[in-house]
Amino acid sequence: MSRRCAYGYLFETPIPPDAQVMRKYTHAPHPLVLRVEGPATGPDRPLGGLRVHVGLVGRAVAYFPNVLFALSALGKMGIGSARLPYALRSAVDLSTGLESPLGGRSAVVRPPESVRVPIALGSPGETPVRVRLETPVRLVADGKLVRQLDLARLVSASLRRLELLWRIHGDDAEQDWSLDSAALVALANCVDVLDDRTRWVESDRFSRRQGQEHPMGGLVGEVSFGSGAAIFIPVLRLAGRVHIGKHTAFGHGHFVVVAEEDQRSVPATASSSNSPGVDG
């Protein structure tokens, strides 16, 4: 399908003919991440409600109206085995905080702001870093599922995810990837795991199109890393926003980074203009 087709680009995501990566593959990482939170309750929401986080990367930002329309149409069809309907109440641009009410023929949603986030390293420090896996993180290393997470595997998956998104969906094709991923993974391999409170959760997804179930289990919980982990905080925080591992389009692979103090982000190269970035 053409990259100008919303469905083809967001859900099929073919490899561009001029791509310098993933030449042996037929499909690239999707530039779309959906994550559902809830139900949320409150005075204005007595029956509870769901909050759907939509993440669009690079050129995919232009297709936000298509995604919003699809979510609205899905609500009319109903979700789950019981086909429960829902209605969209509002859309919030997290980069600006602007909320646009929905529902009704006169509803107007402004296109979201595209924010360029540089892919950078942080300042070295001794501060312990705690990572909270909020949705199942399903990683594969050496052909096997990762059931114990160390910093090297987390950094490796994060860098690979960011680099592929940047190369396939970014607008900085004239710039080269400036991070030495192999060296950074080797550095992360020297960092100790201080506390591992992760656990494996099993889940499956039934594909009506393929007529079979697909395993979607992964790690959730918290893991803490020791001295030397602080330099990776900006990379990990950005990777957490775009999710890592398998089934990211279904909301899996979301994690957040918690540190005892904020880390100052510095460019990975001498000039910040040379640092790769992800638009979203």
Indicate residue ranges for each PLM-predicted region.
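RNA-interacting cores
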Residues: M1-G280
